[in-house]
From Swiss-Prot:
Keywords: Acyltransferase, Amino-acid biosynthesis, Arginine biosynthesis, Autocatalytic cleavage, Mitochondrion, Multifunctional enzyme, Transferase. The keyword Acyltransferase applies. The record marks 224-225 as: Cleavage. It catalyses: N(2)-acetyl-L-ornithine + L-glutamate = N-acetyl-L-glutamate + L-ornithine; L-glutamate + acetyl-CoA = N-acetyl-L-glutamate + CoA + H(+). Its EC number is 2.3.1.35, 2.3.1.1. GO terms for biological process: L-arginine biosynthetic process; ornithine biosynthetic process. This is Arginine biosynthesis bifunctional protein ArgJ, mitochondrial. It comes from Penicillium rubens (strain ATCC 28089 / DSM 1075 / NRRL 1951 / Wisconsin 54-1255) (Penicillium chrysogenum). Substrate binds at residues 185, 214, 225, 315. SUPFAM superfamilies: DmpA/ArgJ-like. The record marks 146-147 as: Involved in the stabilization of negative charge on the oxyanion by the formation of the oxyanion hole. Belongs to the ArgJ family. It holds the Pfam family ArgJ. Pathway: Amino-acid biosynthesis; L-arginine biosynthesis; L-ornithine and N-acetyl-L-glutamate from L-glutamate and N(2)-acetyl-L-ornithine (cyclic): step 1/1; Amino-acid biosynthesis; L-arginine biosynthesis; N(2)-acetyl-L-ornithine from L-glutamate: step 1/4.
Length: 485
C-alpha cells in the first residue's frame, strides 16, 4: 500500500524539491548569498557524518564557534515533549546565566527527541566533545538537533567526527554557507544572511551580524524542527541579549506560519562575543539606552528577513503573503488576529486559487480567540489588498461595508507571488484609529494542490522514493506556532 501510494505521489510533489545532488532550484537561487560580511572571532564548519544511513556525502553536522567567550541567549519550543538538546541547552544557559558560551553544535538527520535518559546523555556528550576539542571547560556549548523523532543518535559516529568539524573551522563565506547547508532537512536551499551595522555610542565602528536558519514544511504534526543561530561581534550583556532576542523572535520567527504546528526541537539562539570592541550594550533600566534600542531594531529586522526565508521555502507553496493588522487597540490582540488569518486553510486555498474572497479573511478576523473585548467592531473594520509594486491599494471592505471590487485588477494582484493583506480595525470599540501602537504583521504561504502530496510523501516509506528529499534527508520541518520562550 505504501509503495503504491508512494508511486502515485512521486510525480505530484512540489517541482522545486531539491534533488539528492544538493542542486538549488532555479526559482530559489536568488535567495542564496554569493558573499557575506561575517562577525569577527567566529568560525564555522559543515561536516559529513552520515547521521542517516542514506546520506553518504552531504554535510549534516554544523559547528559554530567563537574564539572568545560569548554572551548567549535563546528561546525554545513550548511543546511539552521537549527534545533532549532543548533541555540540555536550556540547562547550560541557566547554569551559566548566559555567559561564557563558546560554541553551538547542530546535527541534522535525527531530532534526538523522545529518547529518554539516553538521549539526554547523547546531547551532553555532543556538547562536551566540542568543549574538549576547543580546550574549554565543560558545558560551554549549546546543542541542537533536527530530524526524525523517537530515534537515538548514532552518537559514536557524531563524536568521532566532531574533531574533524573543529579542525576545519573557517571564517570564509563558503564555510558559512556550507554550515547553513549542514542543518537543512527538506529545505530546498540553505538560509543564510549577514549584515553590518553601527551603534550610537560608536558611530564610526562597524559591527557585524550573521545568521542561519532551517525549515520548509511538515512531516508529522508537532514532530520536527525550526532552528536558528545568530552571531554578532558586538558586546552585549546576557540580560540585554535575552530581552532583545525575545522581542525580535515575537516579531519574526513567532510571526510566520506554514502549517501551524508546534515542534519538539525549535530553538533560536544568539551569541555575542564583543570582538569588534566598543561599549557593552546593557539591559535597560528605567529607560532603554540608545545602543539597546538601536540593536533591538537591527536584530528584529534581521530576524524578520531570516524567518521570511522559511516561508518562501514552504512545502507546496506558491505565494508569500504578508498580513498586516492595523489600528488594533493593543498589539497582542492584533497579532492574534494576524495569526488566525495566516493559519486559515480557507484563506490559504483562496489565495492559491487567486480568488479575492475577502469573506474568508473577515471570517478569520471574527472568530479569533483571546482578543481583548471591543477589539473587533464590524462597522469599523476594513480589508484591502496592497500590491507589492506600490500601486494604489485595492479596497475590499471599508468600515464594514463591501466595496465594488475591480475583479480584473484583483486578478492581476493575485497573480503575483508576493501579496499583502491589510486589515484595519479602526481602533476597535473606542474608535481610536492610529492609536493602537505598532502594526501586527504575520508572514505565511498558501496551500496548493501540491501540499497534501508533499506532506503525505513524508509520512509513507519515503526512502522508497529516490530524489524527493532535499540534501539527501527524509526529515521535515514544522513551524512553531505557539511562541518560543
Amino acid at each position: 500500500m505504501a509503495t503504491s501510494l508512494a508511486r502515485m505521489l512521486k510525480g505530484q510533489v512540489r517541482c522545486y524539491s531539491a534533488p539528492l545532488d544538493m542542486a538549488i532550484p532555479a526559482s530559489k537561487q536568488r535567495y542564496i548569498p554569493t558573499t557575506g560580511t561575517y562577525p569577527q572571532g567566529f568560525q564555522v564548519s559543515g561536516t559529513h557524518v552520515g547521521v542517516k544511513a542514506s546520506n553518504t556525502r552531504f554535510p549534516d553536522l554544523a559547528l559554530i564557534a567563537s574564539d572568545t567567550p560569548c554572551s548567549a541567549a535563546a528561546v525554545f519550543t513550548t511543546n511539552k515533549f521537549q527534545a533532549a538538546p532543548v533541555q540540555v541547552s536550556r540547562k547550560t544557559l541557566q547554569s551559566r546565566k548566559g555567559d561564557g558560551i563558546r560554541a553551538v553544535v547542530i546535527n541534522s538527520g535525527c531530532a534526538n527527541a523522545v529518547t529518554g535518559k539516553g538521549g539526554l546523555e547523547d546531547a551532553v556528550q555532543m556538547g562536551r566533545k566540542v568543549d574538549e576539542c576547543s580546550g574549554v571547560e565543560n558545558d560551554s556549548s549549546l546543542v541542537m538537533s533536527t530530524g526524525v523523532i523517537g530515534q537515538r543518535l548514532p552518537i559514536s559516529k557524531i563524536l568521532d567526527r566532531i574533531p574533524t568539524a573543529h579542525s576545519t573551522l573557517a571564517s570564509t563565506h563558503e564555510a558559512w554557507l556550507n554550515t547553513a547547508r549542514a542543518i537543512c532537512t527538506t529545505d530546498t536551499f540553505p538560509k543564510l544572511l549577514s549584515r553590518t551595522f553601527t551603534l550610537p555610542s560608536s558611530p564610526d565602528r562597524s559591527y557585524r551580524l550573521a545568521g542561519m536558519t532551517k525549515g520548509a514544511g511538515m512531516i508529522h504534526p508537532n514532530m520536527a524542527t525550526l532552528l536558528g543561530v545568530l552571531c554578532t561581534d558586538a558586546a552585549v550583556e546576557p540580560a540585554a541579549l535575552q530581552s532583545i532576542l525575545k522581542h525580535a523572535v515575537s516579531r519574526s520567527f513567532n510571526s510566520i506560519s506554514i502549517d501551524g504546528d508546534t515542534s519538539t526541537n525549535d530553538t533560536i539562539a544568539v551569541l555575542a562575543n564583543g570582538a569588534a570592541g566598543g561599549e557593552t550594550v546593557r539591559a535597560p533600566g528605567a529607560s532603554a539606552s540608545a545602543d539597546y534600542t538601536a540593536l533591538q531594531g537591527v536584530v528584529t529586522d534581521f530576524a524578520q528577513e531570516l524567518s521570511q526565508l522559511v516561508v518562501r521555502d514552504g512545502e507546496g507553496a506558491t505565494k508569500f503573503v504578508t498580513v498586516r493588522v492595523r489600528n488594533s487597540p493593543d498589539y497582542e490582540s492584533g497579532r492574534m488576529i494576524a495569526s488566525t488569518i495566516a493559519r486559515s486553510p480557507l484563506v490559504k486555498t483562496a489565495l492559491y486559487g487567486k480568488d479575492a474572497n475577502w469573506g474568508r479573511i473577515l471570517c478569520a478576523v471574527g472568530y479569533t480567540q483571546g482578543v481583548a473585548e471591543g477589539t473587533v467592531v464590524p462597522e469599523r473594520t476594513s480589508v484591502s489588498f496592497r500590491p507589492v509594486d506600490g500601486s494604489e491599494v485595492l479596497k475590499l471592505l471599508v468600515n464594514g461595508e463591501p466595496e465594488t471590487v475591480d475583479e480584473q485588477r484583483a486578478s492581476v494582484i493575485l497573480q503575483n507571488e508576493d501579496l499583502e493583506i491589510e486589515v484595519d480595525l479602526g481602533g476597535g470599540e473606542q474608535g481610536a484609529a492610529g492609536c493602537g501602537g505598532e502594526d501586527a504583521v504575520y508572514w505565511f504561504c498558501d496551500f496548493s494542490h501540491e501540499c497534501i502530496p508533499a506532506f503525505a510523501v513524508d509520512i509513507i516509506e519515503s526512502r522508497e522514493i529516490s530524489g524527493l528529499k532535499a540534501f539527501g534527508s527524509e526529515n521535515a520541518y514544522i513551524y512553531e506556532e505557539e511562541p518560543l520562550k
